[in-house]
């Protein structure tokens, strides 16, 4: 049976996400920015939290873990990098590990760059990836702890996922990401269509996530830094993908 997924807002612009296995009743939160919105989402559905799958140690992704752990006695899964302080962890995971949420199987991808400990969770049967702050809709995370080559390698891992996979990310940044991307590729038809869609969704008060990996591969300039069209957009014809990516990220940091 297909998993049920619920998306909701936490803090100011964070997304909270629940993935639920109807066969067993198991429910996992992908990160826990704060506890109350997670509790409210669970109560609306009549679900009980069994797991928290942490992507990285930033406070806006783990701020609700302690309270949720106390309330539900749920299992807390976190990246294996112990240099990042994350409290209440029951299980540490790394590249290729499989996490069971009831009958649902989540595969761990190490996607460092934004932070050194960052992981993404891929549920292949459900055709969904939870990429948190590595890959955003039409964007990517800032490189705080890693290097540009490290982040580019992480994006390539995510780009290898099938086009049909849905992407859930950690923040509602799509509008600003599109405005930046249009400065690089003002004539990209997929990007322009996405811009119109995002304007409509935001006007209706609806989230711009999830998006499809196939769409990201056509419109996300960070994910396409090795595309000659993107290189031309930053006047770096012939440069490597990682060189173009670094230039894009530097420009976005200043925008």
UniProtKB/Swiss-Prot annotation:
Entry GO MF terms: hydroxyacylglutathione hydrolase activity; metal ion binding
Pathway(s) it belongs to: Secondary metabolite metabolism; methylglyoxal degradation; (R)-lactate from methylglyoxal: step 2/2
Enzyme class: hydrolase
Keyword Transcription included in the entry's annotation: no
Catalytic activity: an S-(2-hydroxyacyl)glutathione + H2O = a 2-hydroxy carboxylate + glutathione + H(+)
Swiss-Prot/TrEMBL cofactor(s): Zn(2+)
EC number: 3.1.2.6
Coiled coil residues, start to end: none
Binding site for Zn(2+) 1: 56, 58, 114, 133
Protein name per UniProt: Hydroxyacylglutathione hydrolase
Organism of this sequence: Nitrobacter winogradskyi (strain ATCC 25391 / DSM 10237 / CIP 104748 / NCIMB 11846 / Nb-255)
């Amino acid at each position: 049976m297909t998993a049920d997924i619920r998306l909701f807002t936490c803090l100011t612009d964070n997304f909270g996400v629940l993935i639920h296995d109807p066969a067993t009743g198991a429910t996992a939160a992908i990160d826990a920015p704060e506890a109350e919105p997670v509790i409210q989402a669970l109560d609306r559905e009549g679900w009980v939290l069994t797991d928290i799958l942490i992507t990285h140690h930033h406070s806006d992704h783990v701020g609700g873990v302690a309270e949720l752990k106390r309330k539900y006695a749920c299992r807390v899964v976190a990246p294996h990098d112990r240099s990042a302080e994350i409290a209440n962890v029951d299980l540490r995971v790394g590249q290729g590990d499989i996490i069971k949420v009831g009958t649902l199987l989540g595969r761990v991808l190490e996607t460092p760059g934004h932070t050194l400990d960052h992981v993404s969770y891929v549920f292949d049967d459900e055709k969904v990836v939870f990429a948190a702050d590595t890959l955003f809709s039409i964007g990517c995370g800032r490189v705080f702890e890693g290097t540009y080559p490290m982040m580019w390698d992480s994006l390539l891992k995510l780009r290898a996922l099938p086009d049909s996979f849905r992407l859930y990310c950690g923040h509602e940044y799509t509008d600003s990401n599109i405005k930046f991307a249009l400065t690089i590729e003002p004539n990209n038809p997929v990007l322009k269509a996405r811009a119109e869609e995002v304007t409509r969704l935001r006007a209706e008060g609806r989230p711009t996530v999830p998006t499809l990996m196939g769409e990201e591969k056509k419109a996300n300039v960070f994910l396409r830094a090795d595309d000659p069209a993107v290189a031309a957009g930053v006047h770096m014809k012939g440069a490597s993908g990682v060189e173009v990516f670094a230039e894009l990220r530097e420009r976005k940091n200043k925008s």
